[in-house]
Amino acid sequence: MVHSKKICLWLLMIMAFAIPKQMNAQQNLQISKVFDQYGKKKGVMMVQLTKEMLQGYNFSFFKSIVIKNDPGAIDFTRECIAKDQEGAEKIKQVVQNGEVTSIVLQLAPRKDENRLILYNESTENPREMTLIYIESKMDTEKIMNMILKKK
């Protein structure tokens, strides 16, 4: 019995160090539910990139999801963002025709990395929403400038 406890403890320690950082991305954020619930549905486009793919951008983690013509998913995403907004350090919103169409949340840094949630919704038909989560050591204003820079 003691031997099996030692083995279990040893395995737990290995797993704790072996779990990649990406598994912790979005930890304790409600938006993770959006990616989990809708990420593999038909007609949804989800992209997740980690350090290797993001070297030129100075991001350590990038995840996005685009959902079209699903009012339930849009409402659910807005609810999740509203909950994550409670812990945000900075909040920026764009209002169009009396309706919030874009949201930028600067979350409290985790370790030495800044975290951003970006949301954009098209109110025209077909309705479409984009949700992006980014982790980076880069200053959040620089991240925003890079994302919004026109090519």
Positions of PLM-derived features:
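Bacterial Sec-dependent N-terminal signal peptides
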Residues: 1-31
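Charged, low-complexity, helix/coiled-coil-prone segments
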Residues: 20, 24-26, 57-58, 85-92, ...
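Early exported N-terminus immediately downstream of N-terminal targeting peptides
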Residues: 28-77
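Extended hydrophobic/Leu-rich segments
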Residues: 35-38, 91, 95, 118
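Mature extracytoplasmic domains of secretory-pathway proteins
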Residues: 64-114
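Short acidic, gly/pro-rich beta-turn/loop elements at beta-sheet edges
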Residues: 74, 128, 142
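A short, solvent-exposed beta-edge/loop patch
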Residues: 105-138
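Short, low-complexity, Pro/Ser/Thr/Gly-rich segments in the mature regions of secreted, periplasmic
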Residues: 139-151
